[in-house]
Amino acid sequence: MTKPRHYLQFKDFTRDDYRHVFDRTRWIKDKFKRYEPYHPLFDRTLVMIFEKASTRTRLSFEAGMQQLGGSAIYLNTRDSQLGRGEPVEDAAQVISRMSDVVMIRTFEQDIIERFAAHSRVPVINGLTNEYHPCQILADIYTFIEHRGSIQGRTVAWVGDSNNMCNTWLQAAELLDFNVHVSTPPGYEVEPERAGLYGTGHFEQFADPMEACKGADLVTTDVWTSMGFEAENDERMKDFADWCVDAEMMAAARADAVFMHCLPAHRGEEVTADVIDGAQSVVWDEAENRLHVQKALMEYLVLGKVED
């Protein structure tokens, strides 16, 4: 049996892989906009395992698999044996014998790595505490749609050094662009983690305005991610000066775009005039989760497909 290919971190793909996935995304999205059916995964099954709740992840994967001609099954850990102590390795053996691709949205990266190691089919990281590769895949494709190649460009990350930030750093090293990160004191990218991504594409700033200077893309996320709710009150104080506003966007390039993976809290990590303004591409970004993930599933299940 051929060993399946997984998508657990952004660095799991090469630059050529991404070139193909982005090309396929463009083609698949065009078919979607023309209401032309495209069913390369007819009679295939996606199993979606959720330990963390979601709106966009479930909707984009479930709708995406149906649009590709397949079916999607939703499992959450509360209603399955995974939530009752069944070993991840055992669950992987069983689930992968009854499906063609698996998407997991969970807390610990170790869980998805262990599942993939015992799976007979491709496994996709729908989100973990450490990485969110599908979101960055959509973000980069959205940038390409609006501004062209991201190579050599600058992304300003303002806020928490969370899973989104980690994945941006991986993407920058692989696709040759720069990331400026600005976080409050105590929330910086840890030195040992920064070393994992190299230093040629990453710079850390104490001042968010400085991070945004000359940026082609300004992006942020909620201040309190799932699993950190106990820290919410403290984080609201610590991050108060890291709200992306019109002044920060003015420091960026005149044609810079704003992104947010959603859900957003207006008045916290971003002001309403920015997220609802002319430079914001958040709705295209959200829609593109659907299209890039269709291209991703096609690639993992079928390999390279040409027009």
Curated annotation (Swiss-Prot):
Which positions are annotated as binding L-ornithine?
163, 221, 225-226
Subcellular location, principal: cytoplasm
PROSITE patterns under this entry? CARBAMOYLTRANSFERASE (PS00097)
Please name the InterPro entries in this protein's record.
Asp/Orn_carbamoyltranf_P-bd, Asp/Orn_carbamoylTrfase, Asp/Orn_carbamoylTrfase_sf, Asp_carbamoyltransf_Asp/Orn-bd, Orn/put_carbamltrans, OTCase_ArgI
Q: Which processes are annotated in GO (biological process)?
A: arginine biosynthetic process via ornithine; citrulline biosynthetic process; L-arginine biosynthetic process
The EC code for this enzyme is 2.1.3.3
- Protein residues bound to carbamoyl phosphate: 54-57, 81, 105, 132-135, 261-262, 289
Q: Where in the cell is it found?
A: Cytoplasm
Keywords linked to the UniProt accession: Amino-acid biosynthesis, Arginine biosynthesis, Cytoplasm, Transferase
Q: Which reaction does it catalyse?
A: carbamoyl phosphate + L-ornithine = L-citrulline + phosphate + H(+)
What is the name listed in the Swiss-Prot or TrEMBL entry for this protein? Ornithine carbamoyltransferase
